[in-house]
């Protein structure tokens, strides 16, 4: 049995297209010149279980849009042109288009995420069907997915191997600089406005009973705190969780891949995004996480099935050859040599010294003025409940040492004086909390004196 469209000579095996007992589960994304990676990204998210994939493109020069158009002709994805109004950036423009898109509005579940992000489900068999069974069993209508930052793994050279198999080294799960989120939720365009990290509840519903109906879980299947119904784009210590799922974020990949992207531009027009500071933030390789390999066989089968279509096959390999030709030209330049040297130096920045873009200063008075009555009442209730729990049982002592230290080769680190003892800020052995204490010179005295 095969999928065919009238007027098309090609066929794709029927097992590629997904259906779900939970209805329409839609991925919404934006792309610009992602040609070498499009088919892997599509194949992976079909393997995970999305029934529909809607991708907005702008200013592509490498065949990304042509591949997506062909996928739409085959009934496997939906391509939309991101027509950008003057003065608006591509990402917000695409979100506005998606908000008005009937296919998205008619979806039962929606997740907005980027082309360098791959959903990784630990729960059950790794499919959205099984995950949503568990979500709905808790009478929840959304789940908040925390980023897991994956680095280059020390890879410099370009490779055609799958992204999800090449890069298996990541930041420690308790590294809070990597706790941005994405949200899979039951979308109703009447109540919600789509956002890149999470949807925003429309103002007219804030003072109604509607917020009481919003029940979201964190990435470990525990209830999210009520404040997140209204604001926030990242996890905090009380809400972070990876037991059920995570969003693998491959922002840098290899040095060669990064070089291609640096001179390609990006979907959000951030001119200085691909620099050494960004590399040091995103090139985190402290621990191995190979959970994604659970999808390898299914993803490869779907990927190979997609390549049986001669049009997709031609477009895919043309995109690879185009990227490799551009890289070959660039690799002979002084600029490439300087880029490699700069990125290798940036890779040596210890995780404790990575500088992230500072968050926008919080104005408590402004926030209070914007808060709805429902949000204030909800927040006060949760604060009271936390105080009562703490009064009954004091907080557990923070975990400072990793249970399974990494056996990777030595990494660059700084040494800090703690109670007369010099300790290394070594992410292979200490948790993020422990590293913060070491840098501040406040690591627990009893533990410091008992370390080997």
Question: Which ranges hold each PLM region?
Answer:
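N-proximal low-complexity "stem/linker" segments adjacent to membrane-targeting elements
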Residues: 1-43
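Catalytic-site signature of metal-activated, phosphate-bearing donor transferases
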Residues: 2-5, 9, 93, 123-349
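The conserved acidic donor/metal-binding loop of glycosyltransferases
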Residues: 114-118
């Amino acid at each position: 049995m095969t999928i065919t469209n009238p007027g098309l000579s090609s066929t794709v095996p029927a097992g590629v297209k997904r259906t779900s007992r939970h209805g329409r589960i839609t991925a919404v994304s934006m792309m610009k010149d992602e040609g070498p990676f499009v088919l892997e990204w599509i194949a992976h998210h079909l393997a995970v279980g999305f029934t529909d994939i809607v991708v907005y493109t702008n200013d592509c020069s490498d065949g990304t849009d042509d591949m997506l158009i062909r996928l739409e002709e085959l009934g496997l994805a939906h391509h939309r042109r991101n027509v950008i109004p003057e003065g608006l950036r591509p990402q917000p423009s695409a979100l506005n288009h998606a908000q008005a898109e009937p296919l998205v509005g008619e979806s039962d579940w929606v997740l907005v995420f980027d082309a360098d992000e791959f959903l990784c489900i630990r729960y059950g068999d790794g499919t959205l069907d099984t995950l949503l069974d568990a979500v709905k069993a808790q009478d929840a209508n959304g789940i908040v997915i925390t980023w897991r930052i994956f680095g280059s793994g020390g890879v410099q050279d370009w490779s055609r191997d799958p992204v999800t198999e090449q890069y298996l080294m990541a930041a420690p799960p308790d590294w809070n600089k990597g706790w941005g989120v994405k949200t899979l939720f039951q979308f109703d365009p009447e109540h919600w406005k789509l956002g890149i990290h999470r949807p925003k509840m429309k103002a007219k519903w804030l003072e109604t009973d509607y917020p009481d109906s919003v029940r979201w879980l964190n990435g470990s299947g525990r209830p999210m705190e009520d404040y997140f119904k209204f604001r926030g784009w990242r996890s905090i210590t009380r809400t972070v969780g990876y037991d059920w799922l995570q969003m693998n974020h491959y922002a840098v990949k290899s040095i060669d891949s990064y070089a291609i992207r640096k001179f390609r531009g990006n979907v959000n027009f951030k001119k200085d995004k691909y620099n050494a500071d960004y590399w040091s933030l995103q090139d985190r390789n402290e621990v191995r996480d190979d959970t994604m390999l659970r999808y390898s066989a299914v993803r490869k089968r779907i990927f190979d099935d997609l390549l049986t279509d001669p049009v997709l096959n031609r477009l895919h390999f043309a995109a690879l050859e185009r990227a490799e030709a551009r890289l070959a030209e660039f690799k002979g330049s002084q600029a490439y040599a300087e880029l490699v040297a700069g990125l290798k130096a940036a890779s040596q920045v210890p995780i404790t010294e990575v500088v992230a873009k500072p968050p926008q200063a919080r104005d408590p008075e402004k926030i209070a003025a914007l808060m709805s009555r429902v949000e204030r009442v909800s927040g006060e209730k949760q604060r009271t409940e936390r105080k009562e729990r703490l009064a009954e049982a004091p907080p557990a002592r923070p975990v400072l040492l990793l249970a399974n230290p990494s056996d990777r080769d030595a990494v660059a680190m700084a040494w800090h004086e703690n109670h007369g003892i010099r300790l290394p800020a070594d992410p292979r052995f200490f948790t993020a909390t422990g590293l913060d204490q070491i840098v501040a010179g406040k690591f627990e005295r009893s533990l410091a004196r008992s370390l080997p």
